[in-house]
Amino acid sequence: MEKFNNIAQLKDSGLKVTGPRLKILDLFETHAEEHLSAEDVYRILLEEGVEIGVATIYRVLTQFEQAGILQRHHFETGKAVYELDKGDHHDHIVCVKCGEVTEFHNPEIEALQDKIAEENGYRIVDHALYMYGVCSDCQAKGKR
């Protein structure tokens, strides 16, 4: 995404445009297929020569989550990871050996969740599905 669009996105979210916010948003745009922790963000920005405090990163990530720019997840590692909220629903399969995260969408699972909710008198407003297993690479390496 272009910097102009990032500025507009921050303003549309009611956030003041600041250097740290732009850097962090740009980082998530360039790593759009990854799930990044606050520590990952800090490490990547340091490698790029950007001086920013860890507390600032945590604060910006929280603000972005509240503004609907990022989604937060808690996978097997126990630490929060973030990804851009692209507006599309998807679920996750996480490798318990190497931490690889695979996103997927399955209409059959979605329909079954709706059916279960309806049978129990609920209407789903949100959900998160995390499946844990061993990826094919780790299986091949014998990390069962």
Curated annotation (Swiss-Prot):
SUPFAM superfamilies: Winged helix' DNA-binding domain. It comes from the Bacteria. Changing residue 5 to S: In strain: CCUG 37603. Residues 1-86 are annotated as: DNA-binding. InterPro entries: FUR (IPR002481), Fur_C (IPR043135), WH-like_DNA-bd_sf (IPR036388), WH_DNA-bd_sf (IPR036390). Its main location: cytoplasm. Keywords: Cytoplasm, DNA-binding, Iron, Metal-binding, Repressor, Transcription, Transcription regulation, Zinc. Homodimer. This is Ferric uptake regulation protein. It comes from Neisseria meningitidis serogroup B (strain ATCC BAA-335 / MC58). The lineage of its organism: Bacteria, Pseudomonadati, Pseudomonadota, Betaproteobacteria, Neisseriales. The gene is fur.
